[in-house]
Amino acid sequence: MKFWLLLGLLLLHEALEDVAGQHSPKNKRPKEQGENRIKPTNKKAKPKIPKVKDRDSTDSTAKSQSIMMQAMGNGRFQRPAATVSLLAGQTLELRCKGSKVEWSYPAYLDTFKDSRLTVKQSERYGQLTLVNSTAADTGEFSCWEQLCNGYICRRDEAKTGSTYIFFTEKGELFVPSPSYFDVVYLNPDRQAVVPCRVTAPSAKVTLHREFPAKEIPANGTDIVYDMKRGFVYLQPHSDHQGVVYCKAEAGGKSQISVKYQLLYVEVPSGPPSTTILASSNKVRGGDDISVLCTVLGEPDVEVEFRWLFPGQKDERPVTIQDTWRLIHRGLGHTTRISQSVIIVEDFETIDAGYYICTAQNLRGQTTVATTVEFS
């Protein structure tokens, strides 16, 4: 009996040990709070570098890529460089990719509606063709695609192209000027340009004063030379005024440009500075009266006048005259005086009241008024 009791206890003990062994592996201690549960390893892991898609770099390149192509002959096209030299007489053909392309080219071609220039638009590209080119055609040619939403269009800055083209012509180192003498106004608040542009990028160009005769250095501080614009006065002042000309040298030949009169402007930029004055503010019946509106401004800024007067609603006949002239006010300072005068003959009671003058330029407008009474 004791034997069977001992045997049963022994079997029960072994069964309990087997169950405990399944839940508590040997040599494993309980983890403390905060202990890292990731098994340490001596292997060095290589950091993973995220792959950059090639498409991204391709897209950024495409965005800045010019849409302009130049015809090279035999059906070949290539993207033009920033500057291109052609011989006068050659045909220029440019194409810009896009279904709605706009163009910009030297104003000389647009001013005279030159028949040598044609611009066409096809389904996939715009085309500009210039035949029988001359030195006067030298300048910037650019294009851009239009983005339109209904009737509202804007320039797509990601799809543009431009090139500056020199048309070299024998005996013409300078881009021809329509006159033999030109005026350049020196404004203290903006750059001034003496437009000595050349037809060959290799030409050496210098600036000269007529009297006293001397070369004016383009030192990069006050004056710089830009072959696409000419001599640029960065900060014009009264000492720069006078008559100047340019001299170009290339291929053992030299040429003198037209002369330029540099005039210093003393009137600051802004809306018109306007005054109004009546010949008399009290007028008897049957007399004549005039009201003068005067503007002092920059020499190269045009002014437009508009009048409101008492007899206007009754269609009272009046005479209006607009004039302008340049005046020199000491130390070479130059001002443009623009005037408008309204003349009323045989003054009547309907002519009494306010005479209102509005003067307008590109920078704004000014309105002034005066009263005229019947006496």
From Swiss-Prot:
Coiled-coil-forming residues are none
Q: Which cysteines are joined by disulfide bonds?
A: 96-143, 293-357
Leader sequence range is 1-21
Asked if the record carries the keyword Transmembrane, the reply is no
Per the record, where are the segments of Basic residues compositional bias?
Answer: 40-50
Tell me where in or outside the cell this protein is found: Secreted
Pfam families hit by this protein: Ig_3, VEGFR-1-like_Ig-like
What residues bear carbohydrate chains?
Answer: 219
Keyword vocabulary terms for this entry: Disulfide bond, Glycoprotein, Immunoglobulin domain, Repeat, Secreted, Signal
Q: Where is this region: Disordered?
A: 20-63
Q: Tell me a GO cellular component.
A: extracellular region
Q: Record's superkingdom?
A: Eukaryota
* Ig-like C2-type domain span: 47-159, 272-375
Keyword Disulfide bond in the entry? The reply is: yes
Against InterPro entries, the record matches this protein to: Ig-like_dom (IPR007110), Ig-like_dom_sf (IPR036179), Ig-like_fold (IPR013783), Ig_sub (IPR003599), PDGFRL (IPR042495)
* Record text on subunit structure and interactions: Forms a complex composed of PDGFRL, TNK2 and GRB2.
Protein name, per record: Platelet-derived growth factor receptor-like protein
Q: Which organism is it from?
A: Mus musculus
